[in-house]
Amino acid sequence: MPHHRASSGQDHLRAGWEQRLERSLPAPRVGLLWMGLGLALVLALFDSTVLWVPARAYPLPSEGHSVKFSAIAPPLQSAFGWQNLTCPACKVLFTALNHGLKKEPNVARVGSVAIKICKMLNIAPLDVCQSAVHLFEDDVVEVWTRSVLSPSEACGLLLGSSCGHWDIFSTWNISLPSVPKPPPKPPSPPAPGAPVSRVLFLTDLHWDHEYLEGTDPYCADPLCCRRGSGWPPNSQKGAGFWGEYSKCDLPLRTLESLLKGLGPAGPFEMVYWTGDIPAHDVWQQSRQDQLRALTTITDLVRKFLGPVPVYPAVGNHESTPVNGFPPPFIKGNQSSQWLYEAMAKAWEPWLPADALHTLRIGGFYALTPRPGLRLISLNMNFCSRENFWLLINSTDPAGQLQWLVEELQAAENRGDKVHIIGHIPPGHCLKSWSWNYYKIIARYENTLAGQFFGHTHVDEFEIFYDEETLSRPLAVAFLAPSATTFINLNPGYRVYQIDGNYPGSSHVVLDHETYILNLTQANAAGGTPSWKRLYRARETYGLPDAMPASWHNLVYRMRDDEQLFQTFWFLYHKGHPPSEPCGTPCRLATLCAQLSARADSPALCRHLMPNGSLPDANRLWSRPLLC
């Protein structure tokens, strides 16, 4: 059983955090209503777009087949014409929306215009446009009456710096304690025969209760393989029984199969579960739908894992509208209390009272799962580029990072180690949030023993470096692959081997394993689901250990070794990579992502370039990393 003991001074920490939270309510600002709904609509539907081109299953790279990093334009175009939103069109669109502010339109009128724009730009089918607008309009109008964004800033946000400059998310800094940073002290390897624990890691389950075998996997909607997707042409097969290689999520039976088949991968000391429970039908989700997904999957996890403690984190798909996580100063029906209260009720058997307290307020918590280890679960939606509520005030929402500093300082004072779990990886966050988090990790490198995230659906990592030289690797965040097939992937899960539960344990990651369900085999006539280990990290990559320096060295080995990179690329996609080859620009962009635990930091990739040139690294950074 977990120990869940309170840390000394924890009541003081909580009181200080709550006082800062009460002072954080921002003053309202004049808003841009029409622009807001258009922007949120595009961001929401973009969240469900196809990021990988459908492809047939590919053999292992050792069999001589190359694979490719697919460009972002074709899959987005096939989803709903996102490519139609060019920079000039974007600026015309948002200028027109801005002009409408002078008439102070009501919510219904704003929604009507947004639907017409969605249809005109072919962003999605008309029924999807209508449902998405009606779902988002009330919250977005509220946000945009409190915030301000020009057409140039909006298009810079959507299409990148080449289309406009935006700095609405102003720079801010977290205060670190005056306690001097101890000299860096890498953990000592465990003694031979020391206990090793296995931690199950689940992320991005995305249960679709509308999944229906035989339906069209390539429908016009953002999510297919479900009632309403229609039936495929006679020449094309329909959605498989256990899942499908397309823009589809999972039926409940596949998640039951995953949990039921965990035996060979265990036993587990504990489970880290980093969110995204509902499906990608973001245009038609109600609060009842989200709560149904939360309770159904929580009950399923508890049924199959029994007494094993489970520690969840909040994903960006838990809310509706998707990505909509208002900071705690937003009260009433538009707050996230409906969700946090439901999570606290569902997860109460796993979490102590003090963790439930902060979960109810801000969706994050800390606890002690075993002696000498503190677990911190972050609500990474407060760092998200897609969380439109942060347009009101993006400065350390909910005071979460300052609270994190206090938790880490208390752990350092006690001599404890810390694991951090969350959904969105720090390298994918808003710049100021990401840079502050990076600074915090650097300060507490001796205390941090592991960081674990999901969200990207693929198998990767992010390395942290010292801030002075950006050359000494000091931490690594592991980004585990998804359970869902979305998009064009095998279902999967991760198991971490960590230094075991004994006095003096370093609690660091020693190795990890990834397990998948091969859909081609499972969906074959008479096929049954068989979850098998895809690979072990240290064995496959030839790593001496799982420390940050080993992952750093792996990146540069993959830069120079094509075959090693192709192995990584195959595993990155859970054994089902895109069909086209991944050339040098693709390889460098992918490797750059592994070096980039800090957002908008091209200098982190400068050594990937042949001459170490920063301008070349800047061009590399501008490439889409997950397409």
Curated annotation (Swiss-Prot):
Signal peptide (UniProt feature, chain positions): 1-44
Effect of residue 128 to E: Retains 20% of wild-type activity with sphingomyelin as substrate; retains 70% of wild-type activity with bis(p-nitrophenyl) phosphate as substrate
Annotated effect of mutating residue 388 to R: Retains 10% of wild-type activity
Residues carrying a glycan: 84, 173, 333, 393, 518, 611
EC number: 3.1.4.12, 3.1.4.3
CDD domains: MPP_ASMase
Keywords (A to Z) from UniProt: Disulfide bond, Glycoprotein, Glycosidase, Hydrolase, Lipid droplet, Lipid metabolism, Lysosome, Metal-binding, Phosphoprotein, Secreted, Signal, Zinc
Enzyme class (EC, first level): hydrolase
Saposin B-type domain segment(s): 83-167
InterPro entries hit by this protein: ASM_C, ASMase/PPN1_MPP, Calcineurin-like_PHP_ApaH, Metallo-depent_PP-like, Saposin-like, SaposinB_dom, Sphingomy_PDE
Summary of the function given for this chain in its UniProt record: Converts sphingomyelin to ceramide. Exists as two enzymatic forms that arise from alternative trafficking of a single protein precursor, one that is targeted to the endolysosomal compartment, whereas the other is released extracellularly. However, in response to various forms of stress, lysosomal exocytosis may represent a major source of the secretory form.
Identification of the protein by name: Sphingomyelin phosphodiesterase
Organism: Mus musculus (Mouse)
